[in-house]
From Swiss-Prot:
Catalyzes the esterification, concomitant with transport, of exogenous long-chain fatty acids into metabolically active CoA thioesters for subsequent degradation or incorporation into phospholipids. GO terms for cellular component: membrane. Its EC number is 6.2.1.3. It comes from Escherichia coli O157:H7. One of its GO terms (biological process) is fatty acid beta-oxidation. One of its GO terms (molecular function) is long-chain fatty acid-CoA ligase activity. This is Long-chain-fatty-acid--CoA ligase. ATP binds at residues 213-224. Activity is the highest with fatty acid substrates of > 10 carbon atoms. It is found in: Membrane. It is a peripheral membrane protein. Its main location: membrane. PROSITE patterns: AMP_BINDING. InterPro entries: AMP-bd_C, AMP-bd_C_sf, AMP-binding_CS, AMP-dep_synth/lig_dom, ANL_N_sf, ATP-dep_AMP-bd_enzyme.
Length: 561
């Protein structure tokens, strides 16, 4: 496919990037922390950590992993916490030790955590105490040998940290009891690491940096193997696209999206480290009044988010009173940005929401609307520099211009493959082209618009939910005979999970089924709607017709609207 989109690039956006500008993320990090040493890198709960402090603490943590725990280059280290100052310290410590970061959603259930730890072969985990009770239930069934435990306030000044830890544990009761007698405290790890020798590993661009887990059409979470080069390439692609709006050493980005999610990891954490910017870490973005109070304290210049976050902010009266004069970048992704939200955003802030599209397997950015656009296009924008895109039919032939086809992408940001899953890798990457599973159309300027999903994936607040996983869990309930899970439109989260169930036990209730699911699934995966049926529609070979149920369920929602 001819790169027609290049003609629509703003004049100061390059058509190609250099993915080999740095040898590794460690090289990028070390150059930035030296260049911006005394400037603030992260702020959380009013506590500022400079680039110099970040360098010192991450070096100490890397030394502890190497010398204190005896871990080697290539070992996997899991990281399970919300946005706290400990996160970047641990993240860059793991990378600087030559190890591979395995990001874990802290809201995972024991079942989900056990799978990810075993699949990745993680030998250590850094976890905040609020979720230690989850780890306790499964740690003995995994290869994890070392548990490094931190508390919410451990990277704050002594007085503030002590107060935060007390309030979190005893007043808010956010730390369920746990028993991990061999755990090492994060503070002790740093204290000991300062006295140990750090040995910078020899890293090459093709070394793995992250195993970033994502669902799959099989419903089993798989680790996308993202190399240092993959991440650096996407970093340069994002920088090339947004760069004209950004000023090195002078940015403050609002990071309400969790850093364990690939969107915030690349666009907030890594990009603004390279640019010498400051990350305002929001630990609990669901507390909108608390988030707005934080925003009022800082002249933020950039904000990233998903549609649900922007919508919640727009509906907050205090947010409407904020000063937006410093803001010059608003980036939306993870799920489609609704037109009404985009229009309200520009009316209030004076800035257009630049919607983009990506997936974990692409580190993540594939396309984004150009920064000079002055309307809400409803599209996912143009492919980013050094990225090829084509639309194909079911036989892998390119479709005619303007016709829908599966979006396929090729570029330096595309993952190596899925960790220890060659068959799944071969299904998604063919001749270097990653098949996204999304059906798109491209207009004459190169703007892409997603029209459907080939996969049955459900997108809840920017998180992928795979029907097979939901169905596997529901089928474990003794009162269920058959189940099908689909996504239906939701005003608050984009989509919500609905299940159609055929009962085995006539006394089965919606309430008991949802309660059962809550024990097995992270909150956003739990079905919000349950409909009991005498039978489910099936194909002539007995396959449940999810699409038929989905169309029917969406029709009901549309009719109600």
């Amino acid at each position: 496919m001819k790169k027609v989109w290049l003609n629509r690039y703003p004049a100061d956006v390059p058509t190609e990037i250099n993915p080999d500008r740095y040898q590794s993320l460690v090289d990028m990090f070390e150059q930035s922390v030296a260049r911006y040493a005394d400037q603030p890198a992260f702020v959380n709960m009013g506590e500022v950590m400079t680039f110099r402090k970040l360098e010192e603490r991450s070096r100490a943590f890397a030394a502890y992993l190497q010398q204190g725990l005896g871990l080697k280059k290539g070992d996997r280290v899991a990281l399970m916490m919300p946005n706290l100052l400990q996160y970047p310290v641990a993240l860059f410590g793991i990378l600087r030790a030559g190890m591979i970061v395995v990001n874990v959603n802290p809201l995972y259930t024991p079942r989900e955590l056990e799978h990810q730890l075993n699949d990745s072969g993680a030998s250590a985990i850094v976890i905040v105490s609020n979720f230690a009770h989850t780890l306790e239930k499964v740690v003995d069934k995994t290869a994890v040998q070392h548990v490094i435990l931190t508390r919410m306030g451990d990277q704050l000044s002594t007085a503030k940290g002590t107060l935060v830890n007390f309030v979190v544990k005893y007043i808010k009761r956010l730390v369920p009891k746990y028993h991990l007698p061999d755990a090492i405290s994060f503070r002790s790890a740093l204290h000991n690491g300062y006295r140990m020798q750090y040995v910078k590993p020899e890293l090459v661009p093709e070394d793995l940096a992250f195993l970033q887990y994502t669902g799959g059409t099989t419903g089993v979470a798989k680790g996308a193997m993202l190399t240092h080069r993959n991440m650096l390439a996407n970093l340069e692609q994002v920088n090339a696209t947004y760069g004209p709006l950004l000023h090195p050493g002078k940015e403050l980005v609002v990071t309400a999206l969790p850093l364990y999610h690939i969107f915030a990891l690349t666009i907030n954490c890594l990009l603004f480290i390279e640019l010498g910017g400051q990350n305002l870490l929001i630990t609990n973005p669901r507390d909108i009044p608390g988030l707005v109070k934080e925003l009022a304290k800082y002249p933020f210049t950039a904000i990233t988010g998903v549609n649900t976050l922007f919508n919640a902010l727009l509906n907050n009266k205090e947010f409407q009173q904020l000063d937006f004069s410093s803001l010059h970048l608003s980036a939306g992704g993870g799920m489609p940005v609704q037109q009404v939200v985009a229009e309200r955003w520009v009316k209030l802030t004076g800035q257009y929401l630049l919607e983009g599209y990506g997936l974990t397997e692409c580190a993540p950015l594939v396309s984004v609307n150009p920064y000079d656009i002055d309307y809400h296009s409803g599209s996912i924008g143009l492919p980013v520099p050094s990225t090829e895109a084509k639309l194909v039919d079911d036989d892998d032939n390119e479709v005619s211009p303007g016709q829908p086809g599966e979006l396929c992408v090729r570029g330096p940001q595309v993952m190596l493959g899925y960790w220890q899953r060659p068959d799944a890798t071969d299904e998604i990457i063919k001749n270097g082209w990653l098949h996204t599973g999304d059906i798109a159309v491209m207009d004459e300027e190169g703007f892409l618009r997603i029209v459907d999903r080939k996969k049955d994936m459900i997108l809840v607040s920017g998180f992928n939910v795979y029907p097979n996983e939901i169905e596997d869990v529901v089928m474990q309930h003794p009162g269920v005979q058959e189940v099908a899970a689909v996504g239906v439109p939701s005003g608050s989260s984009g989509e919500a999970v609905k299940i159609f169930v055929v009962k085995k036990d006539p006394s089965l209730t919606e309430e008991s089924l949802v309660t059962f699911c809550r024990r097995q699934l992270t909150g956003y995966k739990v079905p919000k709607l349950v409909e009991f049926r005498d039978e489910l529609p099936k194909s002539n070979v007995g396959k449940i017709l999810r699409r038929e149920l989905r169309d029917e369920a969406r029709g009901k929602v549309d009719n109600k609207a």
